[in-house]
A protein has these predicted regions:
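A structured binding-face within diverse protein domains that lines the active/interaction site
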Residues: 52, 67-70
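N-terminal active-site beta-alpha-beta segment that forms phosphate/nucleotide-binding
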Residues: 1-61
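Charged helix-capping and loop-helix junction motifs
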Residues: 14, 81-86
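Residue-level signal for inorganic ion chemistry
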Residues: 23, 66, 82, 124
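Short, well-ordered strand-loop elements centered on a beta-strand within folded domains, enriched
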Residues: 31-37, 77-79, 141-142
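Surface-exposed, charge/polar-rich loops and edge strands
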Residues: 60-65, 74-77, 88-163
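Short glycine-rich anion-binding loops that position phosphate/pyrophosphate groups of nucleotides
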Residues: 2-5, 70-74
Length: 163
């Protein structure tokens, strides 16, 4: 669920539920979280994040994970609030899942500022940009939009034929 300056994903969650997708949300317990089915009403926890009531549920299969981010770095890794909760959750999954990062604005740093254990995305979506991580690690972005470079003056080039 969104926190602070992260993008509001409630409209996306609503659309997924209307299409009969199973939606799971984090339930925070101290320094980790588990995924539980989304149930209304949502309540604010001690961190000010909306969450469903706790439930016992074994998450068997995950196809994709949508993770709010503040931005991404050169390695297509998440820039967030630094608590490591998504990192710990993703490391517990039995297989690699498709990771979709969503952000309010297309913030990107051409430097590596994350660690190897930080969550690495496959797709980065903002209202003005769509970027995909290719198998060789390079990034391809929607040509109509530009990423906002943070922490540097380097440019990113796009090739429409790749997208």
């Amino acid at each position: 669920m969104p926190f602070g300056n992260e993008v509001n994903i409630f409209p996306l969650i609503s659309t997924l539920r209307k299409k009969k997708y199973s939606v799971f949300v984090p339930y925070i317990q101290e320094f980790y979280f588990k995924m539980i089915p989304l149930r209304m009403p949502l309540q604010k926890n001690v961190f000010g994040i909306y969450e469903s009531n706790n439930s016992t549920f074994n998450l068997i299969k995950v196809d994709a994970v949508i993770i709010p981010v503040l931005g991404i770095d050169k390695d297509f890794r998440r820039i967030g609030f630094g608590k490591g909760m998504y990192d710990r959750f993703m490391s517990c999954l039995k297989k690699k899942v498709y990771v979709i990062f969503v952000a309010r604005s297309p913030n990107y740093t051409p430097s590596v500022i994350t660690e190897s254990y930080d969550v690495q995305g496959d797709c980065f979506v903002t209202p003005s940009a769509l970027c995909l991580r290719k198998h060789n690690g390079s990034m391809v972005c929607n040509r109509r939009y530009n990423l906002r470079i943070i922490g540097g003056r380097e440019c990113i080039s796009y090739h429409k034929k790749d997208f």
